């Protein structure tokens, strides 16, 4: 028969309420009593019943991670796998489970979130991207549960927080660098404009062109979608145009990889015939030859900081509404 909290109390020589406070991670207990309880738990190999604890206390020790996109559109995207790894590692340190939420559309996402909140299955939410339509945030904000978004949050909310990089400013700086190196005909291969990050990166590119009195050519601003297939199709389309752009600004890793492959197919030498820059990471810079210049996205740090912020909020500690993570630009 599995040991109970009564057994722990007997072995530790403390009351049942003291054992309960330790299991629920409450602070109103002496270090000596806590140590006795922890030793008894280890000796008895006690495994708490999470369902029973959830029904009799403040809920499960779990957080939810939402991609806000279908698994089809996130498969193969290194950003999501890397940031999720950072989040799960931090949650494990805190003794929390991670529920990965997937769905077909925002309405289904919201329905699943509300269901888990009402059932006390989660104590916080991390969103891996920030939709340009913030109605999702407004709906979640009605609940007394912290939500941390990896991305920009424009509206004012009581329970919605942001961890992001300066995508607009970084894109201006990156396009400025291309122009200052002598390029005038610069194309942009971007992700769909239904998320803040894509909007900010494309707007930063356009702002830089305007500041240098370079006309924006609509045919050189191409939506590469969310998958490898759509990105490669868009890259091939872009590199089939005449005249060919001198440089391409890619707004994420998938677009960078697609430009490299399309250029190889068409025997276009990088960087001799086509300069390529974009948002990348150390792994991609190691794979692609020559390594692309651009903005190194601090994926691990975004995941870690978002998780640390969420656990501060869960603990009731004062926390900033917005955190901006610094990036690093490298030009090859």
From Swiss-Prot:
All copies of domain HTH lacI-type, residue ranges: 1-57
Entry superkingdom: Bacteria
PROSITE patterns tied to this protein: HTH_LACI_1 (PS00356), HTH_LACI_2 (PS50932)
Pfam families registered for this protein in UniProt: LacI, Peripla_BP_1
Protein name according to UniProt: Uncharacterized HTH-type transcriptional regulator YcjW
Keyword presence, Acyltransferase: no
Keywords of the record: DNA-binding, Transcription, Transcription regulation
């Amino acid at each position: 028969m599995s040991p109970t909290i009564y057994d722990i109390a007997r072995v530790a020589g403390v009351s049942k309420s003291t054992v309960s406070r330790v299991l629920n991670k409450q602070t109103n207990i002496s270090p000596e009593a806590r140590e006795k309880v922890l030793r008894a738990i280890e000796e008895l190999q006690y495994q708490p019943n999470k369902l029973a604890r959830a029904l009799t206390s403040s809920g499960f020790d779990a957080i939810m991670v939402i991609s806000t996109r279908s698994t089809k559109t996130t498969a193969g995207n290194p950003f999501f796998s890397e940031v999720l790894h950072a989040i799960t590692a931090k949650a494990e340190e805190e003794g929390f489970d991670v529920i990965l939420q997937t769905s077909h559309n925002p309405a289904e996402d919201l329905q699943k979130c509300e269901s888990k909140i009402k059932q006390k299955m989660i104590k916080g939410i991390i969103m891996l991207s920030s939709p340009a339509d913030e109605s999702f945030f407004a709906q979640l904000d009605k609940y007394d549960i912290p939500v941390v978004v990896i991305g920009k949050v424009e509206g004012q909310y009581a329970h919605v927080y942001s961890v992001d990089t300066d995508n607009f400013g970084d894109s201006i700086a990156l396009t400025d660098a291309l122009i200052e190196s002598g390029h005038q005909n610069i194309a942009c291969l971007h992700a769909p404009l239904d998320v803040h990050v894509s909007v900010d990166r494309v707007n930063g590119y356009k702002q830089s062109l305007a500041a240098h009195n370079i006309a924006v050519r609509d045919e050189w601003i191409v939506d590469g979608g969310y998958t490898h297939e759509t990105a490669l199709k868009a890259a091939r389309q872009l590199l089939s145009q005449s005249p060919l752009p001198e440089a391409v600004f890619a707004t994420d890793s998938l677009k960078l990889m697609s430009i490299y492959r399309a250029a190889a197919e068409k025997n276009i030498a990088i960087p001799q015939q086509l300069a390529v820059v974009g948002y990348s990471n150390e792994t991609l810079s190691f794979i692609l030859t020559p390594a692309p210049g651009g903005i190194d996205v601090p994926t691990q740090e975004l995941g870690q900081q978002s998780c640390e912020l969420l656990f501060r909020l869960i603990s009731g500690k004062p926390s900033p509404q917005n955190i901006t993570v610094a990036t690093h630009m490298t030009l090859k």
